[in-house]
Amino acid sequence: MDQFIKQDETGDLIETGMNVANHFLSAPIQGTNLLSKATIIPGVAPVLIGNPEQKNIQYPTASHQGSKSKGRSSGAKPIIVSSSEVGTGGTQIPEPLFAQTGQGGTVTTVYQDPTIQPTGSYRSVELAKIGKERMINRFVEKPRTSTPVTEFKRGGPGAAAQGQTIQEEGIDGNGASAGSKERSGSLSGATPYAHLSLPQQDSTPANVGIAQQSAISANEIMDLLRGMDARLQHLEQKVDKVLAQGSMVTQIKNELSTVKTTLATIEGMMATVKIMDPGNPTGVPVDELRRSFSDHVTIVSGPGDVSFSSSEEPTLYLDELARPIPKPRPAKQPKPQPVKDLAGRKVMITKMITDCVANPQMKQAFEQRLAKASTEDALNDIKRDIIRSAI
């Protein structure tokens, strides 16, 4: 049912109501208890001439109800009931929308002669009647008469449905039809291939072309996108690991630089220690060391070449009884110890006293001891005392 009122119908209702209101406001009303000529509205008296039982009034047809007023801008166009449309039998005029009342007046029912067209107040009553009917009919839904619509499916009609025609169902109004819903036959959401539609006999023909070929399945596209997304995430994880290793490499480089700095410091300190204490030789000649490593026993059992042997080396000999006896080694004469040059050591110790000893009294004591020292051991003792005092 149409829930909206058209603008033209609204204008008709307003004009009808204004005509009725103007009629009752302009008509003179005199209150009385009797129906006399003085109280009858002009134009109504001829109605009383006819038989009251023959009450007949013509109602407007559907053609009159659906007509629109073209000259609404210039004024209201009255609705005229023609005498040619009079039916059989009289019909009582319904009571008007507004009762004609006055001082002590009563509402009177008036009947109309079939030969006389309604004028005056009857014309207003007819207008009100028509307006009421329009208002009632507007909110009453009419029954719909339509033929069943055959269902149309994609891919063209079947062999049995090719000869049938499709008649659309009317909605008797201006609203849009909701139509019928059908599930798509394509899982990917694309429009599949469709045949040409046959021309409809009861409708205006239209140009129909061949539908496009089926598009690529949307599921396959989504699978490809998901695979690319997974690979991208895997690459991102690898890049994160590489960046983490890079930070670790940077940390290792920093630690290596620290180790190198510490090692250089230790090497510098060791060089300083070597300068301060170069060390002492053992005092054993190299020849003696070599000879000690080459000593061995040689047995001469008979005549032969004994030039390789040395008389200084211990050798076993046979006595008269052929018994091996060692020949005693002759006693060695002790060699005098070479006099070492202590002047360089004294210069070094003097420099140590000057740089390492800050106390003047201790410095003076070390200088006195250095002047009295004549052996290497004494110089070593003085050097150790200087280092201890510096620490």
From Swiss-Prot:
<feature type="modified residue" description="Phosphothreonine">
    <location>
        <position position="258"/>
    </location>
</feature>
<feature type="region of interest" description="Interaction with the nucleoprotein">
    <location>
        <begin position="343"/>
        <end position="391"/>
    </location>
</feature>
<comment type="similarity">
    <text>Belongs to the rubulavirus/avulavirus P protein family.</text>
</comment>
<feature type="modified residue" description="Phosphothreonine">
    <location>
        <position position="165"/>
    </location>
</feature>
<keyword id="KW-0693">Viral RNA replication</keyword>
<feature type="modified residue" description="Phosphoserine">
    <location>
        <position position="374"/>
    </location>
</feature>
<feature type="modified residue" description="Phosphoserine">
    <location>
        <position position="301"/>
    </location>
</feature>
<feature type="modified residue" description="Phosphothreonine">
    <location>
        <position position="150"/>
    </location>
</feature>
<dbReference type="GO" id="GO:0039697">
    <property type="term" value="P:negative stranded viral RNA transcription"/>
</dbReference>
<feature type="modified residue" description="Phosphoserine">
    <location>
        <position position="292"/>
    </location>
</feature>
<feature type="modified residue" description="Phosphothreonine">
    <location>
        <position position="91"/>
    </location>
</feature>
<feature type="modified residue" description="Phosphothreonine">
    <location>
        <position position="250"/>
    </location>
</feature>
<dbReference type="Pfam" id="PF03210">
    <property type="entry name" value="Paramyx_P_V_C"/>
</dbReference>
<comment type="function">
    <text>Essential cofactor of the RNA polymerase L that plays a central role in the transcription and replication by forming the polymerase complex with RNA polymerase L and recruiting L to the genomic N-RNA template for RNA synthesis. Also plays a central role in the encapsidation of nascent RNA chains by forming the encapsidation complex with the nucleocapsid protein N (N-P complex). Acts as a chaperone for newly synthesized free N protein, so-called N0, allowing encapsidation of nascent RNA chains during replication.</text>
</comment>
<feature type="region of interest" description="Disordered">
    <location>
        <begin position="143"/>
        <end position="208"/>
    </location>
</feature>
<feature type="modified residue" description="Phosphoserine">
    <location>
        <position position="294"/>
    </location>
</feature>
<feature type="modified residue" description="Phosphoserine">
    <location>
        <position position="257"/>
    </location>
</feature>
<keyword id="KW-0597">Phosphoprotein</keyword>
<feature type="modified residue" description="Phosphothreonine">
    <location>
        <position position="39"/>
    </location>
</feature>
<feature type="region of interest" description="Disordered">
    <location>
        <begin position="82"/>
        <end position="101"/>
    </location>
</feature>
<feature type="modified residue" description="Phosphothreonine">
    <location>
        <position position="298"/>
    </location>
</feature>
<dbReference type="GO" id="GO:0039689">
    <property type="term" value="P:negative stranded viral RNA replication"/>
</dbReference>
<keyword id="KW-0946">Virion</keyword>
<feature type="modified residue" description="Phosphothreonine">
    <location>
        <position position="16"/>
    </location>
</feature>
<feature type="coiled-coil region">
    <location>
        <begin position="218"/>
        <end position="245"/>
    </location>
</feature>
<feature type="modified residue" description="Phosphothreonine">
    <location>
        <position position="375"/>
    </location>
</feature>
<feature type="modified residue" description="Phosphothreonine">
    <location>
        <position position="282"/>
    </location>
</feature>
<protein>
    <recommendedName>
        <fullName>Phosphoprotein</fullName>
    </recommendedName>
</protein>
<feature type="modified residue" description="Phosphoserine">
    <location>
        <position position="188"/>
    </location>
</feature>
<feature type="modified residue" description="Phosphothreonine">
    <location>
        <position position="10"/>
    </location>
</feature>
<comment type="subunit">
    <text>Homotetramer. Interacts (via multimerization domain) with polymerase L; this interaction forms the polymerase L-P complex. Interacts (via N-terminus) with N0 (via Ncore); this interaction allows P to chaperon N0 to avoid N polymerization before encapsidation. Interacts (via C-terminus) with N-RNA template; this interaction positions the polymerase on the template for both transcription and replication. Interacts with host RPS6KB1 kinase; this interaction may play a role in the viral replication and transcription.</text>
</comment>
<feature type="modified residue" description="Phosphoserine">
    <location>
        <position position="69"/>
    </location>
</feature>
<feature type="region of interest" description="X domain (XD)">
    <location>
        <begin position="348"/>
        <end position="391"/>
    </location>
</feature>
<feature type="compositionally biased region" description="Polar residues">
    <location>
        <begin position="198"/>
        <end position="208"/>
    </location>
</feature>
<dbReference type="InterPro" id="IPR004897">
    <property type="entry name" value="P/V_Pprotein_paramyxoviral"/>
</dbReference>
<keyword id="KW-0175">Coiled coil</keyword>
